């Protein structure tokens, strides 16, 4: 019965225009080295047996028939003899050693037995392979020219090889012009790996380009171990490499968008606004793109001017977002001493009155701009700081007195409008609205807030004492305000100056998400395209009722969990035992050490406040 034949695909894959390093460690072989040489267009290229060898796993080898195994042995021996006909040193591959061992183990009787068995039926289709003689294999090829004629010399003994450094192919240490390499032992470094394609960052490419400009492309390729074609390509894109990030490795992606004319006109609009000094936001670019799309009769379903389109368009035209660096609050030099004093006052009040979590709160006033100025602008990549103009209406703002409790509840917003009267209109429910000539919080408005917000808060019990944490605004610490709070059975705690960013819950967890939400709603309102224009063509500010609705939506979006965590982070509602540990850690940082925390009476606390 004839055995089933499986097709054997012996194909070699040619990889062009990419550098690869072979990664297969070769075991210590015999000291005698073969000579292999390939001379291609005047340059030396190493030829290795692994480049023309095919390997099978044990499972794959068992599937092959005897005919296929014989064919495989014959092809591998022919490839080996072909590489031997060249002149470049490499040890004998392990595969050839194993094949020679298998050949010796198979005696001639086995082949005669196969021939005799098949002769009983008919002539045998399987013939013993005609192994070429290794000694005569080189006679099939022309004798190569010796290395001396090229000005190169290969040492006969491996001990004659010079030292060469790690990271370079071994053939660069064999006397090739342009290389100055060294190594401890070339036999230990005699290894190649077939790995992934190499990629280079922009910093490396610029270094190669600068070297090529001072010498030539060929010398740069040899110096850095890259292809000369890569050097030519990198020199063509030198401006892009200079403007790109030093770690960028490729410039991929489509060069033109689906609506190239829209992209081009938006880019022209950005340059025009840059020349005028006006700030450009991505929202403004999206609005301009929608306007251009309407002029070009592009359907709304086909082009939406989304944020993703804006990002890709900016990438295609080398635009980036420039952020305004916020000015951080400078902490005082006596930060540790103030922290210890503040922690002692809070601990003393909590131990003296044992406040309920729902009776501890924090309140503060914050300005909210009607027309929120953008903190970013679109500009060319790599540009220096740019000056931009503002619409001049960023000073039109309202003041909001906000309050939160330690159990996560939010008090109704207390809005102070600028003016002598409250303009007519429809305002959202759930907030208190007042007016002031300058839009500021005053002593009278603070007392009004205590009456309409703090006294009426949910869960307020006359017999239960409360604690309210305020900042150092002078309108908070007046005698009339203190008397009003005392009548409401509430203790006042003043945060030390310069520490509100660290100790005030509203600064820690509320203000940033609140302002971000208001800006997002304002941007969506602009993108809707239904804003009114003034006689001069400028966009009018949003209606007051709409803006207050944005503030209410942003206030309701603050989660109760974040407020609870903010009180714990500021060490207001944490466990008293944990507070002692924190106070010990703070006092240990003082220059003179610190004393254990002592319980302070209420009278001394009132004097300190």
Curated annotation (Swiss-Prot):
Ion transport recorded as keyword: no
Pfam short name (any one): KRAB
Keyword Ligase attributed: no
Signal peptide start and end residues: none
Domain DDE-1: 353-567
Disordered: annotated span: 1-28, 100-127, 588-609
Residue stretches of biased makeup (Polar residues): 108-119
Chief localization: nucleus
UniProt keyword terms in alphabetical order: Coiled coil, Developmental protein, DNA-binding, Isopeptide bond, Nucleus, Ubl conjugation
SUPFAM superfamilies xref list: Homeodomain-like, KRAB domain (Kruppel-associated box)
Coiled coil ranges: 8-28
Domain of life: Eukaryota
Name of this protein: Pogo transposable element with KRAB domain
Organism: Homo sapiens
